[in-house]
A protein has these predicted regions:
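N-terminal loops that bind phosphate or other acidic moieties
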Residues: 2-134, 138-380
Length: 380
């Protein structure tokens, strides 16, 4: 075995993809010292997507002052690549849930304004190509905060300018984009997301995600009504119907809210990573792909990171072995095309112990070593 590609997603709540790959690499090096090992950063559009891209592309890190979800000053950073032409921005760095104490979370009052400030900063630096990862937000403002920071105005029925927060979507009567930053006309945005929810409705942004962001049941209804109303206003102003567009409900409606006003497209995070980092070229001469995530189940094959990896492996006729902290539906996963699906737990443990980072890394190392030892016997 001459070349193994390590393409692990994070084991959420336990260990990140980089550390998982390091543990796997150690085991392979001990058993197959002459094997070429390629570590490939993976994420599916949620937290870690832009970090994975910045790491792999050796991005220049720049910092700027913006506003957090409650419009308090905060310093954030993002990556610049391609000789200053492309900015890689993590939405959550300016308006993510971790920025707000759990008892203060309220998507009626939060805004994506800071993300727009990050984009404006990148435009000043000359960037015209953008990748924005939109997982983990504390907002439900459909992106009006970001657009306001870039020059848009949202007016009520009395021509008063609205604060760009979730509770005001229902009040939007007019949209004024005449003062949008002119550099946006020559810019392109790839919006990387990890969900396919529509803009509103029972499977939409408010009903599915607003409770995690602090909304009570009445606020969920208000936010959903706001999204419905705003989608209709957008349709009247732009003739674009975003209501049931897959992914439009990502990040509190930001997924769909940007499309009518920017040269933007929604893509799954894993597709963005695989395309940007040319994963297929990496895999083409490989003998094996090792991948994995915290839990392997039927959802694994539904547009998530491992599904993208598997499809490339199948195209290049390279076997794919997946490791998981917990494994369900093994036969279904095999039918999807995985060569093998293996749990890393050596014996029954509590969830707390299973999630302990050192325990997870030890289990990855031990399991990978056993996989490689079997392979050695059949490739002598």
């Amino acid at each position: 075995m001459k070349k193994i590609v390590l393409a692990f997603d994070s084991f959420k709540g336990s260990v990140g993809s980089f550390e998982i790959a390091k543990a796997a690499e150690k085991a392979i090096q001990e058993e197959l010292p002459d094997c070429q090992i390629i570590r490939f950063p993976i994420a599916d559009g949620g937290e870690g997507t832009t970090e994975a891209l910045c790491s792999a592309l050796h991005a220049q890190t720049v910092s700027c002052r913006v506003h957090d979800p409650f419009m308090k000053p905060i310093e954030v950073s993002y990556g610049i690549v391609n000789n200053g032409a492309m900015a890689i921005i993590e939405m959550a760095s300016a308006c993510g849930l971790p920025l707000i104490d759990s008892n203060r979370r309220n998507p009626m009052k939060t805004t994506t304004y800071g993300v727009g400030e990050m984009v404006a900063d990148a435009l000043k630096r000359g960037c015209r190509e953008f990748i924005i990862g939109i997982g983990g937000s504390a907002t439900n403002d459909a992106g009006i905060g970001m657009l306001k920071a870039l020059g848009a105005r949202f007016l009520d029925s009395g021509n008063g300018e609205l604060e760009p927060v979730g509770e005001n979507l229902i009040k939007v009567h007019q949209i004024d984009i005449s003062q949008l930053n002119p550099a946006l006309k020559e810019s392109h945005f790839t919006i990387a997301c990890d969900v396919s929810n529509p803009f509103f409705g029972e499977e939409g942004a408010a009903y599915v995600y607003a409770p995690q962001k602090g909304a009570n049941s009445l606020q969920v209804i208000e936010l959903d009504n706001g999204l419905r109303h705003y989608a209709q206003v957008i349709k009247e102003y732009t003739n674009m119907d975003i209501s049931q567009l897959p992914g439009a409900g990502a990040a509190g409606g930001m997924g769909g809210g940007l499309l009518p006003f920017l040269n933007a497209e929604l893509q799954s995070g894993i597709e963005v990573i695989l395309k940007t980092l040319r994963f297929e070229e990496v895999v083409r001469q490989a003998d094996l792909i090792l991948t994995g995530e915290g839990k392997l189940d039927c959802q694994t094959g539904m547009g998530k990171a491992l599904d993208g990896i598997l499809r490339v492996g199948e195209k290049c006729q390279v076997p794919v072995i997946a490791l998981g902290g917990a494994v369900e539906a093994t036969e279904a996963l095999n039918r999807m095309g995985f060569t093998a699906v293996l749990p890393i737990q050596p014996f029954p443990v509590t969830l707390e112990e299973a999630m302990r980072p050192e325990f997870t890394k030890e289990n990855i190392e031990r399991t990978v070593r056993q996989v490689v030892r079997v392979i050695k016997q059949f490739t002598k």
